[in-house]
Amino acid sequence: SLVLRRKSDCPVSHLAAAGLETIAVRVPANATAQAILGAAGVPIAAPSANASGKISPTEAAHVQESLGDAVDRIIDDGPCLVGLESTVVDCTLKTPVVLRPGGVTSEQIESIAGSVAVSDGSPNKPASPGMLQSHYAPDAAIRLNATSVDVEEALLSFGAHRLSDIGMERNLSPTANL
């Protein structure tokens, strides 16, 4: 997503830009999304496919779970290729600033735009919607340094030591070498 200065005659509603003087523009890589945008012939302003404050969906089923009957149609073109939010780059400054890391890396941006800065993640005033710390907060309890795992929990582990033979475990590195 590119954060750009909003022109005075910009036809996009201020509501779609959260009342900001900037506008965030996204051009999806997905061929189906590009075909829809091309057929529309005009810019499309749309919210995220998840309820505010929830983790971004990566499959159509996640959108259905999050939004339910609030939407009439969901276009299922398979799972997202990258399970992250979009990279957000503020292009209103002399040096572009990566406001939120995502599927496009700073190195990829630098290969096109030259030098970029990276935000510390705490803007005084968000430059685009979706930039609040709580916007993508998971709605789940997290326990750190757990010494046991309950039946309804999943375990994210590291190293050879296992707490149990539970079914929901993801080991980041069995050799403890990332």
Describe the function of each predicted region.
Residues 1-178:
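Active-site-adjacent structural elements in enzyme catalytic cores
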